[in-house]
């Protein structure tokens, strides 16, 4: 069965689509859906496949695009990867079964430069990167949007769990209805111009509803497992990627207590992140955690759990999605990790310098991660965010990172 359904199967699919609030023109383009060409970014997973099948079923002129991002043996065959061999094949089979055009674009060189090399360099500098945000920020929501426009599309749709709403001052980004699947943390860097062109038709669904749609359309990926966060890291061994991309760049050094005592040695700061407890390989009586990393001195600084607490976060490369410019002292809610809920904070604004002052201390906030802003009045609305460069205050003092060079 495909999305070219007839009789009872089509009636059942139409009923499900209606119950899920997806009937008619879920992209909000107006007019006849068939007059609108929509590029769908297809990773080969169930979410993007359902997005493409749904829009095709509703009559939009769908063009599926899958990016070939990397090609190394273990990742090509591993379960839970995306944009590699099996996933490209799955995306192509979905498109063929549904009857819409599908293209595979070779972005491997661009992905290596913008994501993989940046991933390695970030670890070497003592930061903890989020490659999925960089991929969205550069490859998917910059380069691919340009390609979509060249293909004559009026918008690009993805299978992300996030909501785009037309507000009084333009398009707004909002958290997904399913808090457990919400991907707003990874999409904070989406710009106003990109948001105008993007659509997220699954944003108000949960995963069970998405899989129900996949089954109604008869998609071969209906039971496919979700993709993992870092698609290009085989078996979760990110250190292997860093050493392959930058051979010999990681230096051994000392593990130092916050009180100045040298407790042991390590094989490179790339093996550690702020908040880490396991794998320190030092014999001490009390539990110790990584408090900060000094890449210039090749030091891993450790301390008791209370030394992890901070209350001030310095940021760079801020993307602001609010209606008005950020004001000094403005209340917001922020997420400092994807799995943590938004917490109360205030912005400290001095010209182009913006810091976040938390209402309560947070532990394990790592430079290199994202700090994402949400409205204090409506915490579902995403106001943007920035990259964490350093932290201070609380019981933990400063955990800024000294850059190499």
Curated annotation (Swiss-Prot):
Organism: Maricaulis maris (strain MCS10)
This protein's name: tRNA-specific 2-thiouridylase MnmA
Recorded GO MF terms: ATP binding; tRNA binding; tRNA-uridine 2-sulfurtransferase activity
Assigned protein family: Belongs to the MnmA/TRMU family.
Cell compartments where the protein resides: Cytoplasm
Source domain of life: Bacteria
Record EC number: 2.8.1.13
Keywords: ATP-binding, Cytoplasm, Disulfide bond, Nucleotide-binding, RNA-binding, Transferase, tRNA processing, tRNA-binding
UniProt site positions, description: Interaction with tRNA: 160, 369
Gene: mnmA
Transmembrane region(s): none
Enzyme class: transferase
Signal peptide: none
Region entry Interaction with tRNA, spans: 181-183
Biological role stated in the UniProt entry: Catalyzes the 2-thiolation of uridine at the wobble position (U34) of tRNA, leading to the formation of s(2)U34.
One Pfam family matching this protein: tRNA_Me_trans_C
GO biological process: tRNA wobble position uridine thiolation
Catalyzed reactions: S-sulfanyl-L-cysteinyl-[protein] + uridine(34) in tRNA + AH2 + ATP = 2-thiouridine(34) in tRNA + L-cysteinyl-[protein] + A + AMP + diphosphate + H(+)
Gene3D superfamilies for this protein: Adenine nucleotide alpha hydrolases-like domains, HUPs, Translation factors
Disulfide bridge positions per record: 135-231
Active-site residues annotated for this sequence: 135, 231
Chain residues that bind ATP: 41-48, 67, 159
Any one GO CC term of the record: cytoplasm
């Amino acid at each position: 069965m495909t999305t070219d359904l007839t009789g009872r199967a089509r009636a059942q699919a139409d009923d499900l689509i209606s119950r899920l609030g997806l009937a008619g023109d879920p992209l909000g383009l107006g007019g006849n859906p068939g007059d609108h060409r929509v590029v769908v970014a297809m990773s080969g997973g169930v979410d993007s496949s359902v997005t493409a099948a749904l829009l095709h079923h509703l009559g939009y002129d769908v063009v599926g695009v899958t990016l070939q991002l990397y090609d190394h043996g273990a990742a090509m065959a591993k379960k839970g990867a995306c944009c590699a061999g099996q996933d490209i094949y799955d995306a192509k089979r979905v498109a063929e079964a549904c009857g819409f055009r599908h293209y595979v674009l070779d972005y491997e060189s661009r992905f290596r430069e913008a994501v993989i090399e940046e991933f390695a360099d970030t670890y070497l500098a003592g930061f903890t990167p989020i490659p999925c945000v960089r991929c969205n920020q550069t490859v998917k929501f910059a380069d691919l949007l340009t390609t979509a426009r060249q293909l004559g599309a009026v918008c690009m749709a993805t299978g992300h769990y996030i909501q785009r709403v037309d507000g009084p001052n333009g398009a707004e980004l909002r958290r997904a209805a399913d808090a457990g699947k919400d991907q707003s943390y990874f999409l904070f860097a989406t710009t106003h111009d990109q948001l105008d062109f993007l659509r997220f038709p699954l944003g108000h669904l949960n995963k069970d509803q998405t899989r129900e749609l996949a089954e109604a359309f008869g998609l071969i990926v209906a039971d496919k497992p979700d993709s993992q966060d870092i698609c290009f890291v085989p078996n979760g061994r990110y250190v292997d990627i860093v050493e392959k991309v930058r051979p010999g760049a990681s230096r051994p050094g000392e593990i130092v207590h916050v009180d100045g005592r040298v407790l042991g040695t390590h094989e490179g700061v790339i093996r550690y992140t702020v908040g880490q407890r396991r794998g320190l390989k030092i014999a001490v009586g009390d539990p110790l955690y990584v408090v900060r990393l000094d890449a210039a001195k090749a030091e891993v600084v450790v301390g008791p759990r209370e030394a992890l607490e901070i209350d001030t976060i310095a940021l760079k490369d801020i993307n602001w999605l609010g209606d008005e410019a950020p004001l000094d002292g403005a209340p917001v809610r922020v997420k400092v990790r994807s799995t943590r809920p938004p917490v109360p904070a205030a912005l400290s604004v001095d010209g182009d310098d913006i810091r976040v002052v938390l209402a309560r201390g947070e532990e394990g906030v790592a430079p290199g991660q994202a700090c994402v802003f949400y409205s204090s009045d409506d915490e579902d609305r995403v106001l943007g965010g920035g990259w964490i460069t350093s932290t201070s205050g609380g019981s933990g003092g400063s955990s800024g990172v000294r850059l190499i060079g």
